[in-house]
Each structure stands twice: as structure tokens, then as C-alpha cells.
């Protein structure tokens, strides 16, 4: 039985966020989060693709950069989020977008999977004289919108990309129960409470100095 892995994890990251002078008001937390979402959400950084920002966990006292003539303030931010990071030699479920006689293109969220016709598990699949891929267990032709189990052979993404491209191998066809369970698990890895109006009161200035001690390499300078 093929073991499945999820490419999605909940984690904590750091970033540096710029706030305009007109955003320095009682809604500072909301403005910080909105600016953070615009900067890092729905795009890749060196850790993977950030699918969702949950909440800001802590932020430093603002710093006015002398070289910045519009008087914007820079904050060091610690935040919780969900990232997508496919790992080589693991198996995930993808949905076929298109296929032809030379390759299969499938997807899972921000993941775009390319499968060459030579990377098919010959124990589970065969190719007929028309070039169609046949599931040996059901004798049915694989077609667009089918769900497949993909073994990840390699990944490719760069900071700022809006997708992650993977090279994969076609392993098997998952059951309906596995598909439902897999996608439900991906959506419910960990329940994280979304921001409440009182969250800003819980971020005390006593903790803000701790963020400034984090090494610069942990910050997302996109």
C-alpha cells in the first residue's frame, strides 16, 4: 500500500514589514497583517509556498529608517502560517489537468506536477496501442479530472513564484475514501484560532525585544 504524505505544514516564520505613516493608528495590528499578507501570502519564499497567514504572534517596536524620506516605519514580525513544501521521494495525491501521449499535467493547490510518460509504474499501469494509459486494476483509461498518486522526483521554485513545479512519477489510482480523507487532512492539519479583536492587547511590548534577537537569516526579505 502506497504511503501518502501531505505537502502542507503549519509553522512560524519571520518577516520585516513596512508601515506607512497614515497606517500608524489604533488599527496597527490590522494594518501590519494586511501589509504582511500582501508581501508574502500566495507566493513562494525560500521555505515554500505560503498558502495562508493565520495571525501575527509578536512584533517589535517600529524603527524609522533615516534613509526613507516618507517616514515609513519598519517592524520585525513573527507570524503563524501554512506553507506548502513538497518533499522529494514522498507520495501525494494530485488531480489531472490534462494529458497527452507524452506527459501528464496534474495539480494540488499551488503544486503543478509534470509526469513524463516514461515515469509510470508499470505494475499498476499499461499503455495501449492508441497511447492511452490504462489502470491495470480496473482496465479503465486514465483521463482529465482523475485523481492520481504521484511520487515526487524533484521540485523547482524560487522566491516570488506563484506556484511550485514538481517532476513526478505516476504510482497508482487512490480510492474515493483515500481522496476524501487526504484532502480533509490537508485542510485540517491543525486548528489555529484566527485573529480576534483583542489579539493586539496580547502582544506586549515586553516580548517585542525578543524578535530583534532572531538572526537575520530567519526573516523573509522578499
Regions found by a protein language model. Name each.
Residues 1-222:
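Single-stranded RNA-binding regions, centering on S1/OB-family and related RNA-binding modules
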Amino acid at each position: 500500500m502506497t504511503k501518502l504524505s501531505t505537502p502542507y505544514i503549519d509553522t512560524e516564520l519571520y518577516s520585516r514589514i513596512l508601515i506607512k505613516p497614515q497606517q500608524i493608528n489604533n488599527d496597527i495590528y490590522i494594518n501590519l497583517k494586511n501589509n504582511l499578507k500582501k508581501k508574502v501570502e500566495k507566493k513562494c519564499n525560500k521555505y515554500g509556498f505560503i498558502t495562508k497567514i493565520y495571525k501575527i504572534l509578536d512584533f517589535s517596536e517600529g524603527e524609522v529608517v533615516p534613509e526613507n524620506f516618507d517616514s515609513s516605519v519598519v517592524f520585525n514580525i513573527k507570524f503563524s502560517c501554512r506553507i506548502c513544501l513538497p518533499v522529494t521521494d514522498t507520495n501525494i495525491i494530485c488531480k489531472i489537468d490534462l494529458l497527452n501521449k507524452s506527459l501528464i499535467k496534474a495539480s494540488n493547490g499551488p503544486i503543478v506536477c509534470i509526469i513524463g510518460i516514461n515515469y509510470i509504474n508499470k505494475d499498476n499501469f499499461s499503455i495501449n496501442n492508441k497511447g492511452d494509459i490504462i489502470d491495470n486494476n480496473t482496465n479503465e483509461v486514465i483521463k482529465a479530472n482523475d485523481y492520481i498518486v504521484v511520487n515526487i522526483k524533484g521540485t523547482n521554485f524560487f522566491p516570488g513564484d506563484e506556484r511550485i513545479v514538481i517532476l513526478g512519477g505516476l504510482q497508482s489510482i487512490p480510492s474515493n475514501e483515500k481522496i476524501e480523507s487526504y484532502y480533509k487532512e490537508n485542510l485540517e492539519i491543525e486548528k489555529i484560532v484566527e485573529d480576534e479583536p483583542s489579539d493586539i492587547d496580547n502582544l506586549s511590548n515586553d516580548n517585542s525585544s525578543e524578535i530583534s534577537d532572531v538572526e537575520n537569516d530567519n526573516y523573509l526579505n522578499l
